[in-house]
Amino acid sequence: MKLLLAGTPEFSVPIFEELIKKFEIVAIITQPDKPKNRGYSLEASPVKKLAQKYDIKVYDPEKISTIYDQIKDLEFDFFLTAAYGQYIPEKILNLPKIASLNVHGSLLPKYRGAAPIQHALLNGDDETGISLIYMTKKMDAGNILKIAKIKLNGNENADDLFLQMSKIASKNIVLWLEQIYQKDFSEIVQDEEKVSLSPKLLKEDALLEVDKLSVKDFINKVRAFSLNPGAYLIKDGKRVKIFRATTSLVKNAFVVEVQGQKIYCYEYQFEGKKRVKLNFNLLFFNSVI
């Protein structure tokens, strides 16, 4: 089986590494190198580093449409994307012999869009999962081929859930592709009446307005924004980023009072200071259904 892959962040790496071990990868597409250290140098994406590690041809165009002529004559059975980060034109979706597929971080049709994992946390969901779908011209609207559900416990933040979702996808992806290759699957048409969207979380939305949020909403916002850009509040004119918080007592935590109830922030960072991480023994990974 031959594959063309497209992905960018660390989320994609374990998934692609499993595929590299099992199948022939004709090329990998990723986002261009990005500035680091205040723009003085460029850094390759985690997926580009993976491609270089295995000496696989890698493309990193500003727009994927510009490499159409370079990839149109490649022979591959599947085009698989996982957190690539660009809209893919239909002429590229039509290139594989069998299908173009996408690994999406929600139980579709819930949370179509760029930030499904964060929105599951923001809304305090008790269940989420991975969907493997056909890619179509309409974003995240293709038929569902495979799913893996995950129970949420309310303690995990975006960092934890990205890691867990990536592990779940990497554990299943080889078997899923083999089953689809052998036509051992059934399709589920997405119910358009149940569609919800998950737009990218914006920096301007990261402010924790203590006087306007419920305790539950405060904690869920912290969970959702933990990865980037980080939820924050203002104390004595300075920004304090909060990455983990709970209503359970945590010794030496930074305490915030919301609606008359104490919230213990046990991973936080004051402006200009180092990040503080405190032990909280109730934190544990979620379970797979």
Curated annotation (Swiss-Prot):
What EC numbers are recorded for this enzyme?
2.1.2.9
Any idea which GO molecular function terms this record carries? methionyl-tRNA formyltransferase activity
Q: Which CDD domains match?
A: FMT_core_Met-tRNA-FMT_N (cd08646), Met_tRNA_FMT_C (cd08704)
Reaction(s) catalysed by this chain's protein: L-methionyl-tRNA(fMet) + (6R)-10-formyltetrahydrofolate = N-formyl-L-methionyl-tRNA(fMet) + (6S)-5,6,7,8-tetrahydrofolate + H(+)
According to the lineage, what is the superkingdom? Bacteria
Keywords carried by this UniProt record = Protein biosynthesis, Transferase
- Carries keyword RNA-binding? no
InterPro entries, per the entry = Fmt, Formyl_trans_C, Formyl_transf_N, Formyl_transf_N_sf, Formyl_transferase-like_C_sf, GART_AS, Met-tRNA-FMT_C, Met-tRNA-FMT_N
**Residues reported to bind (6S)-5,6,7,8-tetrahydrofolate:** 106-109
**Pfam families in the cross-refs:** Formyl_trans_C, Formyl_trans_N
Function description: Attaches a formyl group to the free amino group of methionyl-tRNA(fMet). The formyl group appears to play a dual role in the initiator identity of N-formylmethionyl-tRNA by promoting its recognition by IF2 and preventing the misappropriation of this tRNA by the elongation apparatus.
Family to which the UniProt record says this protein belongs:
Belongs to the Fmt family.
Name of protein: Methionyl-tRNA formyltransferase
Traced from the root, the source organism's taxonomic lineage reads:
Bacteria, Bacillati, Mycoplasmatota, Mycoplasmoidales, Metamycoplasmataceae
Task: Tell me the gene name.
Answer: fmt
